[in-house]
């Protein structure tokens, strides 16, 4: 599967496609996101849109390992995983987990770094409307206050290098909301790793 993922120049902070040689996009230069780096394996376009939909919504949980191999093929992902102290999957609300039957981000995280993945440290404390039908401003408001760390174990991230894992990143609202919660708990370095990134922020 990795051979079908073509390398793409991307903003180092949000992974949106950018011209070769441009380290950061204009949006990130104007307002730096709460992640230090963001890496994406592929653009969220056909055939990846269809494959990811099958993975998430049609019970193809077994595809996680192949997708993780694809993610590892992206530049800088291997070093980020090697240097990480903890790998945290983006959490689902209880309602979404019940609908889907599994957390696709958790399966990816475990396939990427089984010894470093902590499934219960980052929590989604509020169920949110599905982001797909919302514009950027609405998405940012939708996830505000939706993420928190387990208060009994939040100190585990203090001064540590944290990797956040998700399958798809669109506006970045969910990823950055989660990263903000991790940053507020004292994480030293936060890197986001996603399977697919949309071409627009």
Where are these regions (language model features)?
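Glycine-rich phosphate/pyrophosphate-handling loop used in enzymes and phosphotransfer proteins
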Residues: 1-201
